[in-house]
């Protein structure tokens, strides 16, 4: 299950308990709440959750070199900080995360310094095959896509959120789910 470099025999949780704890992880129940429900030591549940995250991280790293093709959605989101003050693009104290969603497939995310074209275009060219259909919002950073070998469609959120296939609802939903989980 785990790659050898992640082997750790310090976790003392019975196999039966791991089988019972795994669904709680999937349902996004906190480790401490799962421990209370299962009647195990909270530290055991925390360590078990950490091991699951390590395994997930390992397999995601193996898939990190995947190149997307076909219909993909691009968007950036801002994480961290408090809701005080400026929100959205340019919000101070927040981390910019750029995401690529393959429709009906995987999502690739990467922390970037900013959402400018010079920052995003190298990631886009590395992760998306030329001639792919790329859907974005109206951010000016995506202006170069149509001259970079991609079929580019924009959605103007001030007018509408979807126009048949022209939308970025998939990646927007991903951001919503990620932020909801991280708030826990």
Predicted regions and their residues:
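Residue-level recognition of single "structural anchor" positions
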Residues: 1-184
